[in-house]
């Protein structure tokens, strides 16, 4: 399954960058049905793998080069935390070209209150920012995503 994910999700970056894709213990889909407190232990376990992989990359492979951070779905959640805990306010922040994080909503409050140095991307030429999006099937009502209402 990991090979399929790399082929379908990481291949577009092969022409412009070296791809470093960590293997990590992912939570199961049923974990999302648990209450927030019950989700924490499995999410923390998965994130610990992601954090260890990023630190290994930063120490052994980055060598001062610019990088993109890419995550999808569950990886988007881990990448948000990684941006906050291991990139923002560190020398790696200056090397971040952009973070591409599709597949999960990111509340405006996250940028306003937590990730204050890495804003949402607003234009294609912007760097040091976070691009995120959702795709929707026909008949969906994306305007109902609460995180992007004006009062959030």
Tell what function each PLM region has.
Residues 28-32, 77-78, 109:
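Short catalytic/ligand-binding loop motif for oxyanion handling, primarily in non-cytosolic enzymes
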Residues 52-63, 84-152:
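Surface cap/lid and interfacial helix-loop subdomains adjacent to catalytic sites
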Residues 18-23, 68, 97-100, 131:
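Hydrophobic/aromatic beta-strand patches that form the interior of the parallel beta-sheet core
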Residues 71-79:
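Gly/Ala-rich beta-loop-alpha elbow adjacent to hydrolase catalytic centers
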Residues 1-66:
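Active-site catalytic motif of lipid deacylating hydrolases and related acyltransferases
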Residues 32-36, 81, 106:
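Short amphipathic alpha-helical patches
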Residues 23-27, 72-73, 101-105, 136:
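Active-site-proximal beta-strand/loop segments in catalytic clefts of secreted hydrolases
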């Amino acid at each position: 399954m990991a090979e399929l994910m790399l082929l379908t999700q990481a291949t577009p970056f092969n022409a412009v960058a070296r791809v470093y894709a960590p293997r990590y213990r992912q939570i199961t889909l049923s974990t999302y049905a648990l209450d927030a407190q019950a989700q924490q232990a499995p999410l923390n376990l998965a994130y610990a793998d992601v954090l260890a992989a990023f630190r290994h990359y930063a120490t052994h492979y980055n060598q001062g080069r610019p990088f993109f951070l890419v995550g999808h779905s569950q990886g988007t959640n881990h990448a948000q935390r990684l941006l906050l805990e291991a990139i923002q306010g560190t020398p790696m922040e200056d090397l971040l070209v952009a973070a591409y994080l599709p597949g999960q909503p990111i509340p405006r409050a996250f940028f306003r209150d937590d990730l204050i140095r890495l804003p949402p991307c607003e234009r294609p030429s912007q760097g040091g920012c976070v691009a995120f999006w959702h795709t929707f099937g026909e008949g969906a009502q994306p305007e109902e995503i609460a995180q992007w209402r004006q009062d959030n």
